[in-house]
């Protein structure tokens, strides 16, 4: 399996940035099939890999942006993440 980070589309990134600024509660679907509801907290970059920092069930998690299939919130609709 190729685990090289694939940057996501700029518009999708902008929507995640907006979600973090407003601490929106997102419904996320990950490429491994996991679904979760989590509050968007921050976007961070380490070693050229970008992560969405979320708070879910009292825990802080970092989700690799290229491992997110989609995210949704009533204010932004459903966004299916595409690679840039």
From Swiss-Prot:
Top-level taxon in the UniProt lineage: Bacteria
Role played: Suppresses temperature-sensitive mutations in essential genes by modulating rho-dependent transcription termination.
Pfam families given in the database record: ROF
Source species taxonomy: Bacteria, Pseudomonadati, Pseudomonadota, Gammaproteobacteria, Enterobacterales
Gene3D superfamilies: Rof-like (2.30.30.400)
UniProt-recorded name of the protein: Protein rof
Name of the encoding gene: rof
GO biological process: regulation of termination of DNA-templated transcription; transcription antitermination
SUPFAM superfamilies reported in the protein's UniProt record: Rof/RNase P subunit-like
